């Protein structure tokens, strides 16, 4: 079959269980596509062909013996921030260019236990700090919809791989929008779960109180299948929450859009820099949800102006602490011929970290320094609580909150030169991480240049099933999620 890459996760699972095709055939199909198409997209950092075929053969044996799970034999790609035993894990940085993890991240462990086949590791912004996937040490990834544009970030490789049909779905992480924004830029569905829903064990840390892993795929249904595998408590992660996990696939029709109250924050639709096409597509999608029976309720989120300064104090502060472990001594990049220990530290870090990482470490170290700790970091944590309370107050009157996932569509590679401008572009996504809430991106159309636009729905704590269900029903009534970039239509 030449069009296996066009099948949904459900269709792939059915095809494998009914022996219409084998996991080896499916895996070989994707590996051929990667070999032919990825040199243009540059989504993969490492392709694990031999391991993938071994895993596919094991999956076929399990399917034959009747020992399969719902997803046995289906391939996926992992963001290169998840530790993978015996496979290079670089986090997009020269600092970890030769790091091979001795263990699997819990998310990777769970996908293996479910019989999923690892195609490889995909590109990302260095240490997940960025929203373009240009800061990666191995170079930029291209957006399959327009190869001279960025796919978003930091999970840009995950988004590009799925959008180019080089993987049926992928894992991502989201610290300030790193699943939702690239999903928006590449026309995909991406879910950022509640903080503590998915284990962070084995994810290379950026900002520990903000990082969360989640699925990226074409549809809410496809995301639900992966959530069923990766969600749940993990004793190895102290921030993982002991809470019963929903069957996200079974609950896809569990929330009725009829009577659903969708909050429309006044402040969100008056943000400077909100593109007219993005605003129009988001408003059209809300009108569609209204036609399906939802009620739109105007709400106030008065802390909106505080999002960016609060986030860009807390996230860099946590990053400067987390990244202090990379010193050229135990592992990671080590400079050549250091004059002394201080020279080893200085040069290993200045040569091993890229400019954006160094910028955020400097901001974070400054915010945590003795004279400024109370004025900056402590104050930012207090404002963070106010942002959380702002959302909780809104949820007293609405079920979900709607917003664009990004103020613009994807921009050209090399165009994002001003870091402050880039930080301001995170306005719609970062508050969700500050508050620890779940949120989802759904594709809702295109701008005048045929670049995808995304709608973001933000839910209350533990409402992943509700968000997936709403988007699933929206996708039953629209076809934006089925649209494919021209490069994805190519056959290997």
From Swiss-Prot:
Q: Does the keyword Ligase apply?
A: yes
- What are its E.C. numbers? 6.3.5.7
Gene Ontology cellular-component terms listed: glutamyl-tRNA(Gln) amidotransferase complex
* Active-site annotation: 79, 154, 178
* An MF annotation (GO) of this entry: ATP binding
A GO biological-process term: translation
Q: Which family does it belong to?
A: Belongs to the amidase family. GatA subfamily.
Oligomeric and partner information: Heterotrimer of A, B and C subunits.
Record protein name field: Glutamyl-tRNA(Gln) amidotransferase subunit A
